[in-house]
């Protein structure tokens, strides 16, 4: 049962973040060409997409093997087995939410490709929803890991590794 739950967590996450959100952005952007003539836009968008996907995949793989769990936890509801160890190294030494940081970079690449206000609006809406999700997740991490999480939270930014941009609650 745990293996099925874990598989479903990865499947749902992949479909949602890599497929559904970009498809919604494309659909509501008036369905522009997927291969616009602006070469620079294609290159910049592709670089952002690649960096974002690589960051997210690194974080997911790291969580699976180091944290012994799965990232799919939605608004306090366990969709797949939760991690049993707090991860503070690897990609998690740079950001408390490197999967989302990668997803934000990936979706910004999609926005560059589409270059429409609709895709940007959907991107901003997605960020707002994820901020609510992250706050819910942080409460759970505080409950599960206590002082260890508190120390980690005070030293690592929510999304960005730069102390200047670190969000302190």
What residue ranges belong to the model's regions?
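Membrane-anchoring alpha-helices and their flanking helix-loop junctions
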Residues: 1-89, 101-169
């Amino acid at each position: 049962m745990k293996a099925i739950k874990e598989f479903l967590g990865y499947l749902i996450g992949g479909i949602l973040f890599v497929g559904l959100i970009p498809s919604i952005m494309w659909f509501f952007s008036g369905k522009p060409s997927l291969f616009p003539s602006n070469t620079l836009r294609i290159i910049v968008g592709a670089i952002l997409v690649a960096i974002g996907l690589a960051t997210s995949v690194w974080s997911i793989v790291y969580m699976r093997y180091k944290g012994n769990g799965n990232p799919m936890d939605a608004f306090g509801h366990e969709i797949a087995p939760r991690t049993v160890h707090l991860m503070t190294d690897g990609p998690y030494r740079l950001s408390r939410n490197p999967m989302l940081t990668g997803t934000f970079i990936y979706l910004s690449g999609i926005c560059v490709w589409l270059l429409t206000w609709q895709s940007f609006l959907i991107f901003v809406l997605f960020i707002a929803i994820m901020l609510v999700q992250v706050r819910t997740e942080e409460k759970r991490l505080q409950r599960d890991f206590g002082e260890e999480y508190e120390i980690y939270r005070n030293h690592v930014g929510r999304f960005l590794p730069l102390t200047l941009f670190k969000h302190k609650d």
